[in-house]
């Protein structure tokens, strides 16, 4: 049996830009992608801490070191600049993988700077 497990999470990312007219996606600072082991075009689930909205889109690379978290296209309707997001990826795993697996959690602070990286 396969289970869909949390693979990686950017916790409390601050939205820096929302552009309704841009092709859909979520731009994420490349440093944050590396820290969370997330990849461009990977599907992500986003949870808005401010308003409870839950939605999905895919990643595009943002400028390295910029702290960018940009919501584009339809996703821009789900959050405002300054809102806090939890950004997650999931992966199917079998029972053997689940038994020893730990997701990577990147805790973010002001300016989307990395505060800590945990493998819970």
Swiss-Prot record:
One MF annotation (Gene Ontology) recorded for this entry: aspartate 1-decarboxylase activity
Keywords from the UniProt entry: Autocatalytic cleavage, Cytoplasm, Decarboxylase, Lyase, Pantothenate biosynthesis, Pyruvate, Schiff base, Zymogen
Entry-linked CDD domains: Asp_decarbox
Protein name as it appears in the record: Aspartate 1-decarboxylase
One Pfam family cited in the UniProt record for this chain: Asp_decarbox
InterPro entries associated with the record: Asp_de-COase-like_dom_sf (IPR009010), Asp_decarbox (IPR003190)
Enzymatic reactions: L-aspartate + H(+) = beta-alanine + CO2
Subunit-structure text: Heterooctamer of four alpha and four beta subunits.
Catalytic residues identified in the record: 25, 58
GO BP terms: alanine biosynthetic process; pantothenate biosynthetic process
UniProt cofactor note: Binds 1 pyruvoyl group covalently per subunit.
Essential cofactor(s): pyruvate
Processing and modification events after translation: Is synthesized initially as an inactive proenzyme, which is activated by self-cleavage at a specific serine bond to produce a beta-subunit with a hydroxyl group at its C-terminus and an alpha-subunit with a pyruvoyl group at its N-terminus.
Modified sites of kind Pyruvic acid (Ser): 25
Family: Belongs to the PanD family.
């Amino acid at each position: 049996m396969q289970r869909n497990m949390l693979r990686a999470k950017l916790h409390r990312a601050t939205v820096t830009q929302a552009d309704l007219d841009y092709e859909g996606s979520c731009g994420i600072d490349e440093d944050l992608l590396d820290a969370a082991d997330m990849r461009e075009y990977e599907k992500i689930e986003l949870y808005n801490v401010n308003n409870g909205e839950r939605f999905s889109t895919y990643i595009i690379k943002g400028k390295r070191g910029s702290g960018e978290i940009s919501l584009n296209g339809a996703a821009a309707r789900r959050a405002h600049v300054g809102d806090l997001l939890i950004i997650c990826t999931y992966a199917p795993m079998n029972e053997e993988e689940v038994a020893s697996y730990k997701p990577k959690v990147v805790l973010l602070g002001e300016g989307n700077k990395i505060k800590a990286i945990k493998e819970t």
